[in-house]
């Protein structure tokens, strides 16, 4: 486990939390009531504030991901999936939601709208070569390993 600093902009909302003991990602909550028009009516997503700021340790990132239930039942997803939060970002976390259904979606303040997955990462150093080593797969892509 790692310790992550969090600042609640809206103290009436719960902290992001894990829905179950085995959950990998934390639920994020909407800070506002909102209406999300059907796909195509607004030409993109609607940016929803979550009411939190976080300070990830160096070497960590967070991904904002859709909630599977909202996607399956209502057609609601995160437009820029995954949304990337870097360790040096200190602003409020926002979720860019999109409605792929054909009816408006009414979101309520305090509802779970997305998930936050915190991951450790490594930075790279490029080592330029004249030619990459060969593999069995080679340059095969886009279905080359079968359907």
Curated annotation (Swiss-Prot):
Q: Which cofactor does it need?
A: Mg(2+)
Keyword terms of this UniProt record: Hydrolase, Magnesium, Metal-binding, Nucleotide metabolism
Q: Does the keyword Metal-binding apply?
A: yes
The disulfide bonds in this chain are none
Q: Name one Pfam family in it.
A: dUTPase
Q: Which GO molecular-function terms appear in the entry?
A: dUTP diphosphatase activity; magnesium ion binding
> Per its UniProt entry, what is the enzyme's top EC class, as one word?
hydrolase
Q: Which residues bind substrate?
A: 67-69, 80, 84-86
Q: Report if keyword Glycosyltransferase is assigned.
A: no
Q: Describe the function of this protein.
A: This enzyme is involved in nucleotide metabolism: it produces dUMP, the immediate precursor of thymidine nucleotides and it decreases the intracellular concentration of dUTP so that uracil cannot be incorporated into DNA.
State what protein this is by name: Deoxyuridine 5'-triphosphate nucleotidohydrolase
Q: Which gene is the coding source of this polypeptide chain? A: dut
């Amino acid at each position: 486990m790692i310790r992550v600093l969090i600042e609640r902009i809206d103290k009436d909302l719960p902290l992001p939390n894990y829905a179950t003991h085995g959950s990998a990602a934390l639920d994020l909550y909407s800070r506002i009531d909102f209406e999300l028009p059907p796909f195509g009516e607004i030409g993109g997503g609607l940016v929803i504030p979550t009411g939190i700021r976080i300070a990830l340790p160096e070497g960590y990132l967070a991904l904002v991901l859709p909630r599977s239930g909202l996607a399956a039942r209502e057609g609601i997803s995160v437009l820029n999936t995954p949304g990337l939060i870097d360790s040096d970002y200190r602003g409020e976390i926002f979720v860019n939601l999109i409605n792929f259904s054909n009816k408006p979606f009414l979101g309520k303040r305090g509802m779970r709208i997305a998930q936050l997955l915190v991951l450790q990462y490594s930075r790279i150093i490029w080592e330029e070569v004249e030619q990459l080593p060969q593999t069995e797969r080679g340059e095969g892509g886009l279905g080359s390993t079968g359907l």
